Amino acid sequence: MPVDKKSGNGRPSLDSVSSISTTSIVFDHLNDLEIHKKHRPHLMTESIRRDDHLSDFDDDDPLKQEMDGEGDLETGPFLAGRDAYTFGGGKYMDRKFRRIMIVVAGLLVAAWVGGLFVYIASKSYKHATTVEHDPEKTKAAALTSGKKITMDQVRSGTWYAASHDITWIAGPKGEDGLMIEVGADGKDYIVIEDGRAENPDSSAEAEVDVTASRRTLMKNGSFRYQGRMHIPSGAEPSRDQQKVLLRTEQKSNWRHSHTACYWIWDVATETAEPLIPASPDARVQNAQWSPTSDAIVFTRENNLYLRTIGSKKVTQITKDGGADLFYGVPDWVYEEEVIAGASTTWWSEDGKYVAFLRTNETGVPAFPVQYFMSRPSGASPKAGEETYPEVRDIKYPRSGSHNPVVDVQFYDIARGDVFTVDINGGFADEDRLITTVLWAGSQVIVKETNRVSDIMRVVLIDVKKRTGKTTRTVDVGKIDGGWFEISQNTKYIPADPKKGRDQDGYIDTVIHNDGDHLAYFSPPDNPDPIMLTSGPGWEVVDAPSAVDLENNLVYFIATKEGSTQRHVYSVQLDGKNMKSFTDTEAKGYYDVSFSSGAGYALLSYKGPKIPWQKVVSTPANNQRYEVLIEENKELAESARKYDLPLLNYGTLNVEGVELNYLERRPPQFSEKKKYPVLFHQYSGPGSQSVSQKFSVDFQSYVAASLGYIVVTFDGRGTGFIGRKNRVLVRSRLGEIEAQDQIAAAKHWASLGYVDPSRIAIWGWSYGGFQTLKTLEADAGRTFSYGMAVAPVTDWRFYDSIYTERYMLTPQQNEDGYTKSAVHNVSALASNKRFLLMHGASDDNVHFQNSLTLLDKLDMGAVENYDVHVFPDSDHSIFFHNANKIIYDKLENWLVNAFNGEWLKVNNAKPVELVHPTQLVREREKAKLRKRWQEIQNK
């Protein structure tokens, strides 16, 4: 379930600002009383609205136009309590009281002047920070007097860390360290760069042909064909770099897939020809070069074709593709939940065979997605039907319904025939998921599971002999009662006796020591691997990252230094001599991409400090290379001049399990105050929200600029806390996760700096589901408010592959599905209020989820909620300014909640009409009551 500066303002120190504001407010309101004393209106006992706050201070706040009354810098906006303030039970405010106020004000002024003198003399005041944002340092000392971050900055990407992607390619002769650049500033449009020739070490440069360091494949970012101009949106060079496959007129389909017009660019002649000569404007779903650069396989209208280079011949490989049959491309559910990509086509390394998936959706029910404001198909409606919504029917298998039937097929280029290989003992068609297809020389490794993903088998197919066998079967349910994790990272290791590899093999992720670890299977049919990593207490992540075949080294990312960190390591193929590639002495969260031969790497440091990127040589490379390509200077400057939240990392023990949390505190946090708390979580199985990555997002904004505490807490069921704690949620999604969020909220409610009456929770997608389940389980005892965006409310409505992995089928687990649905509306009614938002054209979590919940709320006469629907928005909620609106709604709704506005929604009664001057007097008195209460509290 799944979504890219200025100098300090020189304000006085925090202490000075707060003192000035306190005394000034007293005198201002004494003057107000003098002006209005002749009217002497009664003071009514009432809850004080936060929009009545004075906002004379902090006038430069960019959010002030959107929200009345920010409050002063010390308090932060909207932190005052909600209790009613009264003076003498409604008696007149007489002269005696005024004299008391004057005396109090005088004492406060004297105390402030004396304190200011001592404060300045001791030189203990702080200016805006001048150091790089460091979460570890902010634990000890708050950043002071900086600018406030704004939601517009968060939305516009001001706080995004700049980053670069490198597309590594192998040279025509297998050369390592080559990169392709497309559309780079100051360079030709498509350029092959050889990093070896730009080595800072001059001695290494001498070994490389510098003239070959940069090769242009396409000079201009456009081309003409038959008088028409075309602008590429993507490019893929052939292995021999003589031609380039170009995409134009690209149109998005689902999350990963698209259609486009494809062209073959000839580097030597600088001309283009259509991939399909007879149909230049034909829309193609997927196209791939053969490793031998002499052919392209592609899918059009769900059929597979072969284009031979050197001729205009196009061979149709399959002929029955259509609405229900897919060849070489995934259907919706495989694209979303299995492949995480747009292609199910795989060339053999010698270019003699093509493996592909055949997906049959004949039995899969369709779900209609309606578009009321737009027509994504681009088709014009029929005359007289212009006012009807466009409907797109998606074959969407829900839990317990018919799944697509998927099998692996092969095309023999020389013989021109399609064939399959039957394996005894396999899963039945309706009970089979194919998760991995990997060429291993002339053999193919296929990993498949049953539909509930708890039995996995590995099949080895010999395409030349057209035979196959099952090499190993793993019953994950018997290991820990959990499920098999889908991965696309299995790596083939070819035999090389000179390097000590007598036989072919492959590296895969297996369950070992309560976690995911790397295993080396050689030969491929050997069921007993060499364990490359073993733990316990840590796991590998999306591993392996790369294999250096020259040096028998395997690179991978792991949580060895801590579950919220990511470091890069290497290990030998015999499982010995594991070394860190990154600096493990400091906390860090790294990502990495390796060159084709693993001699070079793009190393990306993502936090906790300001992110940076370097291109470096790997330890086994004798040519030392290190170039900083991104240091995010502008981001670092912003972090120095803006007040960012204080980050407090830790663990909370729940049921004997140490669970990670991240507490974001306001920049001027004080344990003497009472703060509202917003919990933000995703909570999906195997997910992780608490990490050491640098991030300034909506949660950061709420903490830093609204002045609330924001807690992210990863409960049981989430990732990297050991499989036994991850798989506890199987068959009962939402139950344990809710218990853990409630336990965390109770912990924060017990803290002296938290207002236990103002605790809220929010989330999107699975996080929206978990928000509702937590409110349901808590029934208002701990959480007062919640905000759920695009939530699942009944797992019977979600797709089969994702849902059944964790819940089994509804037929197997009827009681579990019933309990996991959001169903106890009386418990939801016990909360003060909650917000529900959804995109009406969500193809992932269907709008039916929210409509079903609304119907249950109606049937239960529950009214303590608000709803916002976004027309034509999908799961990301972006259509027609929707993404801005949804975050504005989240912010304003939360502020109103913590201000107590939602306490007035039941048994609404009209307000007695009064003269406008009376309203002014009442408002001024309300301001005074509030400020007097603040003085007493201090």
From Swiss-Prot:
UniProt gene name: DAPB
UniProt-recorded Gene Ontology molecular function terms: aminopeptidase activity; dipeptidyl-peptidase activity; serine-type peptidase activity
Residues bearing glycans: N220, N360, N824
InterPro entries with a match to the protein in the record: AB_hydrolase_fold, Peptidase_S9_cat, Peptidase_S9B_N, Serine_Prot_S9B/DPPIV
Catalytic activity: Release of an N-terminal dipeptide, Xaa-Yaa-|-Zaa-, from a polypeptide, preferentially when Yaa is Pro, provided Zaa is neither Pro nor hydroxyproline
Residue ranges that the UniProt entry lists as topological domain Vacuolar: 121-938
Keywords for this protein: Aminopeptidase, Glycoprotein, Hydrolase, Membrane, Protease, Serine protease, Signal-anchor, Transmembrane, Transmembrane helix, Vacuole
EC number assigned by the record: 3.4.14.5
Cell location: Vacuole membrane
UniProt-recorded name of the protein: Probable dipeptidyl-aminopeptidase B
Main location: membrane
Keyword Endoplasmic reticulum: no
Single GO BP term: proteolysis
Membrane side Cytoplasmic: residue ranges: 1-99
Biological source species: Pyricularia oryzae (strain 70-15 / ATCC MYA-4617 / FGSC 8958) (Rice blast fungus)
GO CC annotation, single: plasma membrane
Similarity comment: Belongs to the peptidase S9B family.
